[in-house]
Swiss-Prot record:
This is Sodium channel modifier 1. Residues 167-180 have a biased composition (Polar residues). Component of the minor spliceosome. Within this complex, interacts with RNF113A, as well as with SF3B1/SF3b155, SF3B2/SF3b145, SF3B3/SF3b130 and CDC5L. May interact with LUC7L2 and SNRNP70. Transmembrane segments: none annotated.
């Protein structure tokens, strides 16, 4: 029985909404598949043309139609039914109704709530667990270093051979750490290079010295002083 709501009392509207939601749950219709309008009528949220129905009985009759079932399959991304269901849609609908009526009301309500929650939640990717599986057998990789105790008879020869290598390494490190003595001519050339750089001369890459534009010189000489012989 359809009726119109008179006035703009929000408390009355809330009571009406609660009653309509209760009617939807009582007839096993998920809230995502039907919308309740402000005038008390229902609109199908599955069909693309959004049909508006006056009563809950008309909504249930609409949901049993072919157009609604096809749009329901497109909405949930299911494959179309086989030839047997296309030829006998009434039998398919009757079997579907028998399955829903055979279940208890509480079970069907919880099943619908879980289905709506799963559709809203992001899809679970089971491939994430495969990344952690190779890490489980890693402790067994540390077992190969254990076999050396089996080679005990030859261990004496093997353990004695690395000793001179360690001594040679220490000698090489000592020779590398001690720098070679610098000759007097090389020291004079290094001192001359440092004095030229500190006084504002820079090498041009061709073996010549030029003045730095950012440095002020006391004299107008275009050539740097020569390397002292002594």
């Amino acid at each position: 029985m359809s009726f119109k709501r008179e006035g703009d009392d929000w408390s009355q509207l809330n009571v009406l909404k609660k009653r309509r939601v209760g009617d939807l749950l009582a007839s096993y219709i998920p809230e995502d598949e039907a919308l309740m309008l402000r005038d008390g009528r229902f609109a199908c949220a599955i069909c693309p043309h959004r049909p508006v129905l006056d009563t809950l009985a008309m909504l249930t009759a609409h949901r049993a139609g072919k157009k609604h079932l096809s749009s329901l399959q497109l909405f949930y991304g299911k494959k179309p039914p086989g030839k047997g269901t296309e030829q006998n849609p009434r039998q398919h609908n009757e079997l579907r109704r028998e399955e829903t009526t055979a279940e208890a009301p509480l079970l069907t309500q919880t099943r619908l709530i879980t289905q709506s929650a799963l559709h809203r939640a992001p899809h679970y990717n089971s491939c994430c667990r495969r990344k952690y599986r190779p890490e489980a057998p890693r402790p067994s990789v540390s077992r190969p270093p254990l076999p050396p105790p089996e080679v005990e008879p030859q261990g004496g020869k093997i353990s004695r051979e690395p000793e001179p290598e360690a001594g040679s390494q220490t000698k090489e490190s000592a020779t590398v750490s001690s720098p070679a003595p610098m000759s007097p001519t090389r020291r004079r050339a290094l001192d001359h290079y440092l004095t030229l750089r500190s006084s504002g001369w820079i090498p041009d890459g061709r073996g010549r010295w030029i003045k730095d534009e950012n440095v002020e010189f006391d004299s107008d000489e275009e050539e740097p002083p020569d390397l002292p012989l002594d």
